[in-house]
């Protein structure tokens, strides 16, 4: 969810510890969080296993470095053969900072699908191989796509999203 919030809009915020630690246990019989700070002072264990602090920091570094994520009205959605996957193009006005963001909307199951990069609205302008670098991976990883309908899989436990920078 944070990848979506951080890439779809130029403005994003979150309530820190509960979100970073994935604390989502509901109070019995209510929607409210069982460990809410509403009526108590809480000392959070920020190093608790299973936190997503590194992913949030990585996403924030990407946002700060790239102009494409500092604008809101520069989104072009990319069709995908699987409705559990959302994909879109983000780019600056000059089209010198361009990204394809792909997110698995199913937080429990691995999902795979083909992206349709043939739409004229995307204006990718490539006729051959598309060179990409995934900045959301633990370490930047390069990909070469020869197909205008590339297939990819996203595992929510290992790789829930890709943030591909298009390298010209």
Where are the language model's segments positioned?
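Hydrophobic faces of well-ordered beta-strands that scaffold small-molecule active sites
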Residues: 12-16
């Amino acid at each position: 969810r944070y990848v979506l919030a951080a890439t779809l809009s130029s403005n994003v915020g979150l309530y820190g510890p509960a979100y970073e630690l994935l604390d989502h246990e509901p109070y019995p019989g209510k929607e409210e969080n069982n460990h809410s700070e509403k009526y108590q002072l809480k000392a959070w264990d920020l190093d608790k296993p299973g936190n997503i602090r590194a992913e949030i920091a990585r996403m924030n570094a990407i946002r700060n470095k790239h102009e494409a994520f500092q604008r809101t009205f520069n989104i072009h959605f990319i069709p995908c053969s699987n409705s559990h996957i959302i994909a879109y193009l983000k780019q600056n006005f000059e089209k010198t900072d361009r990204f394809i963001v792909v997110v698995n909307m199913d937080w429990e199951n691995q999902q795979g699908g083909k992206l349709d990069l043939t739409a004229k609205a995307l204006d990718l302008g490539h006729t051959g191989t598309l060179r990409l670098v995934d900045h959301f991976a633990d370490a930047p990883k390069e990909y070469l796509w020869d197909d205008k309908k590339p297939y990819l899989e996203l595992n929510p436990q290992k790789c829930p999203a890709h943030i591909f920078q298009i390298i010209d």
